[in-house]
Amino acid sequence: MYAVIVTGGKQYKVAPGEYLKIEKLEIATGESVTFDRVLLVGNGDDVNIGAPVVAGATVVAEVISQGRHDKVRIIKFRRRKHHMKRMGHRQWYTEIKITGIQA
């Protein structure tokens, strides 16, 4: 069984037992989180597509950890002007484990 969920403005295809890094959620480590914006639920050849969401479908996950991704380095410079600016960004994430899909 698998599902497509929306969280943090992105869509993820998930299945029970999968680990996933999503945009940061303000939920403590070890707690459970429920995603109710389920766009699609599939079980073998039986696929249920929502319009826009599947009615009554939820995905339950457990929060494993919070952290930050690797640094993305940014360099801005102006040609011929001896001007260069170096910056970086580390995005926060929440790692979850999918525990169940109810359709």
UniProtKB/Swiss-Prot annotation:
It comes from the Bacteria. One of its GO terms (biological process) is translation. Pfam families: Ribosomal_L21p (PF00829). The keyword Ribonucleoprotein applies. One of its GO terms (cellular component) is ribosome. GO terms for molecular function: rRNA binding; structural constituent of ribosome. Coiled coil: none annotated. Belongs to the bacterial ribosomal protein bL21 family. PANTHER family: 50S RIBOSOMAL PROTEIN L21 (PTHR21349), LARGE RIBOSOMAL SUBUNIT PROTEIN BL21M (PTHR21349:SF0). NCBIfam families: L21 (TIGR00061). This protein binds to 23S rRNA in the presence of protein L20. HAMAP family: Ribosomal_bL21. Part of the 50S ribosomal subunit. Contacts protein L20. This is Large ribosomal subunit protein bL21. It comes from Pseudomonas syringae pv. tomato (strain ATCC BAA-871 / DC3000).
